[in-house]
Amino acid sequence: MALRLAVSSALRPALNSQVRNASSAVSVKDVLASAPQAEVTTLKNGFRVVTEDNGSATATVGVWIETGSRFENEKNNGVAHFLERLIHKGTGKRASAALESELNAIGAKLNSFTERDQTAVFVQAGAQDVEKVVDILADVLRNSKLEASTIDTERVNLLKELEASDDYHQLVLFDMLHAAGFQGTPLALSVLGTSESIPNISAQQLKEWQEDHYRPVRMVLSAVGGGVSNVSSLADKYFGDLSNEYPRKVPQVDGTRFTGSEYRYRNDNVPHMYAAFAVEGVGYAHKDALALQIANQFIGQWDVTHATSRTAASRLVQKIGHDHGVHNLQHFNINYKDTGLFGIYFVADAHDLNDTSGIMKSVAHEWKHLASAATEEEVAMAKNQFRTNLYQNLETNTQKAGFNAKELLYTGNLRQLSELEAQIQKVDAGAVREAISRHVYDRDLAAVGVGRTEAFPNYALTRAGMSWWRM
């Protein structure tokens, strides 16, 4: 999950250089402590505001909401994403065309997305237009005009999008991975919904979803950039009168449960095999979350377009980057609020079971190494790579705004980057070994494949290999 740091244009080159060089004179932690710090304000109604003024000429201001497909059921699956799409279609105050014209006039962009556990609506604009942006955000979130004709038009668009998504094999694969690993729980549901649920979502269901989920205690307004220092007072002006009264029951997440399982969708018209294997990971604020992130970095990723794998930083890439017919290889660590997925995704020719089994044997060998033999030198290298990716990705207003909002939604608190850096520094080889031993060794796997799956690795043998690590 991308984490990004917003710094002023004047500070950014110096910060990047100092972080990369990590000189003894100035520590990374000291550099980060000198960067702009985020401030958190909570309004009387529980609506939270986080601002980070970095003095830049632009700003990102958005509202992140604790909602998404994990709050849905099979009958209304896709309703959160459906509602998010309608936010762009006008309000009682601003028709769709007027909203678009108003944004264009100030050179602003309105964007939104829905994930399994959050919806975000945000605007990128000039620093001088921050109040206008907060006004627009409040209008689209509070006064969406859910007209029947607009809903029907968007329903058609969503069904087309759903059909087109079948061609995005990685997206299909990760939806299948959630469906297999979290079967019987709302985390198994796709954000997009299904061809059965979308046609039956009514205007009343959309209205009730907005009333139940767009409540102040479930929302965070996050602003990063220039001109955002007074956003907390603007939030009080435009969101301070929102109530926490629920006409129905308070939305809650049902308990999670991970199930070791296998699911294959064979389609020989797809030229390759797309595969993913994962154990249950940990929640965002779990004590082992950072250690698993660094372990994830240690294994790394590779693509066939890369010039070489023999000198790669990743041991796994060195072993199989040019063998076994691999086209793409990516280790992943997904964190939700209370659970996650830790595993490997790869694309391969899959002509031979020995090749595909060899891939998983190599992955299991790396997991074994991390659990029993990871060295301080290896972990230090992985931490440096993790830092580079982290701080590069934290350089835009938009991604830093998302990071700040997610911290509050998932943990109720906000870590400054200097605090996060201090936590990274504390992760040593022992912490990585213990985290992998606790969460990966002898754990059940969810295994899914799409495409040419005839040579899919044998599940029983792969699972048995998870408990043969210790000498």
UniProtKB/Swiss-Prot annotation:
Extract the InterPro entries matched here: Metalloenz_LuxS/M16, MPP/UQCRC_Complex, Pept_M16_N, Pept_M16_Zn_BS, Peptidase_M16_C
Please cite one Gene Ontology biological process associated with this protein. proteolysis
Q: Where in the cell is it found?
A: Mitochondrion matrix
Q: Which GO terms describe its molecular function?
A: metal ion binding; metalloendopeptidase activity
**Quick check: keyword Transport in the entry?**
yes
Q: Does the keyword Electron transport apply?
A: yes
Q: Got a GO cellular component term for this one?
A: mitochondrion
What does the UniProt keyword field contain? Electron transport, Mitochondrion, Respiratory chain, Transport
Domain of life where this protein originates? Eukaryota
- UniProt xrefs under PROSITE patterns: INSULINASE
Similarity annotation = Belongs to the peptidase M16 family.
Name this polypeptide is given: Cytochrome b-c1 complex subunit 1, mitochondrial
Q: What is the lineage of its organism?
A: Eukaryota, Metazoa, Ecdysozoa, Nematoda, Chromadorea
Report the gene name. Answer: ucr-1
